[in-house]
Each structure stands twice: as structure tokens, then as C-alpha cells.
């Protein structure tokens, strides 16, 4: 895999090039530590099993829409915040694994995209 291809694609997607973005698990752990709460406390408060939250913290499970909504309610954020953290993590790892394949795809841009590029993000 060409590192210049990978770097170019990571930059194009607004992702760090020399390190992975903050993982969903690291983010959850940082919020918990800031509040002085345990994973078990948070899991009980949001109505999920402690093992489910622990798997998120260990990056063995991604943040689903349901989990994002629960974390948002608990931490006073938005569900989109948590989904964005998960997406950045997933996209970074996929680009590192398959950059040449993605780079080889020939772009075709629909008129709707060209005309509304400023509203699509």
C-alpha cells in the first residue's frame, strides 16, 4: 500500500495521518473519568449491560445508534457526536487497510452533488 495514497485519502477525509483518531472507547473512558463514574455505573444509568459498555471501551464493539442515543442522554452530548467519533475511527482504519482500492475508483459526480456541494457534509 502506498503511504502517499493513504496519506492523501486520510487528509481528504479530514482524518489524522500519523495516528488514529481518538477511539470511541477512549472517548467514553475520558468522559467517565472526568465525571468520576465507573463503567458499571454508566451502564446501569443508560440501561445496558456492563459487558456491552466494556466492549465499547475496549474497542471490541462499535457505537450503534442506540448506544449513541443512550450516551448522549447520559453525558449531555448529541447522538451525532458519538456516531461521528465511531465513523472517524472506522473510516481511518478502512483507509489504512484499503487505500489503493478506494483510490482506484473513478469518481463520477451527479449534478445534484455539484449543485448542492455546500449543503452536503
Tell where the protein language model's regions lie, with residue ranges.
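Residue-level detection of the helix-turn-helix DNA-binding "recognition helix"
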Residues: 58-60, 87
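Short amphipathic recognition helices of helix-turn-helix/homeodomain-type DNA-binding modules
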Residues: 81-101
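N-terminal flexible/basic segments that precede or flank functional cores
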Residues: 1-30, 34-35, 100-121
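Residues within the alpha-helical elements of helix-turn-helix
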Residues: 34, 45, 74
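Short alpha-helical DNA-recognition segment
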Residues: 37-55
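Short, basic-rich loop-to-helix N-cap that marks the start of a DNA-contacting helix
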Residues: 60-73
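Residue-level signal for the short linker/turn that defines the boundary of a DNA-recognition helix
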Residues: 36-37, 66
Amino acid at each position: 500500500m502506498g503511504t502517499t495514497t493513504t496519506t492523501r485519502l486520510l487528509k481528504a477525509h479530514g482524518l489524522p495521518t500519523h495516528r488514529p483518531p481518538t477511539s470511541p472507547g477512549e472517548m467514553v473512558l475520558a468522559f467517565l473519568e472526568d465525571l468520576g463514574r465507573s463503567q458499571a455505573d454508566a451502564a446501569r444509568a443508560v440501561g445496558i449491560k456492563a459487558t456491552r459498555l466494556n466492549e465499547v471501551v475496549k474497542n471490541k464493539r462499535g457505537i450503534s445508534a442506540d448506544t449513541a442515543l443512550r450516551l448522549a442522554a447520559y453525558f449531555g452530548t448529541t447522538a451525532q457526536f458519538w456516531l461521528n467519533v465511531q465513523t472517524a475511527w472506522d473510516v481511518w482504519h478502512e483507509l489504512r487497510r484499503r487505500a489503493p482500492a478506494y483510490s482506484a475508483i473513478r469518481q463520477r459526480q451527479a449534478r445534484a452533488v455539484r449543485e448542492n456541494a455546500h449543503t452536503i457534509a
